[in-house]
Swiss-Prot record:
Tree of life domain: Viruses
Gene name per UniProt: DNA-U2
Family according to the record: Belongs to the nanovirus U2 protein family.
Entry protein name: Protein U2
Amino acid sequence: MEDFKQPKLSYGEIVQMKEEQDAFWSCYHEFLRRNEDVLGEMCRRHGRKLPAYPKLPTYAPIRWVLKTKAIYDVRVDECKSCSHEEISRRDYNPIKKEGLKDLYDSGNYRYQVYYSSSCNRDKSD
C-alpha cells in the first residue's frame, strides 16, 4: 500500500495562507456589519471563540496554530448571555429600607446612613 504524503509547505506559503485567512475574517466582519439590517442585529459583547487559522498545518508556528479569534456573529435575540443578563437585571430588585439615606456617592462606592429622628427634624426645619 502506498503512503501518500503531501509535501510540507514552505514558510512563505504558510504566511500567505495566514494572510488569506486574516483577509477572510476582516471581510466576514465587514459583511456582517454591512448587512446587519437584513441579518438582524449582532451582539457586540458576546462572541464565539474559534481557531483564527483553521487551515494552517500542524507544523506551522504554534502561536498561529493555537491562536483563537472572537467572532461576533451571534444575533442579539439568540444570544444566551444577553438574555441571561436581561433576566438578572429585570429580577434584581434592591431592597428599599425606610430611613436609609445616601450620605454621598463616590463613583464605585455608595455610602448610606440612617439619620436619627432628631436629625430628621433639623433637616425639615
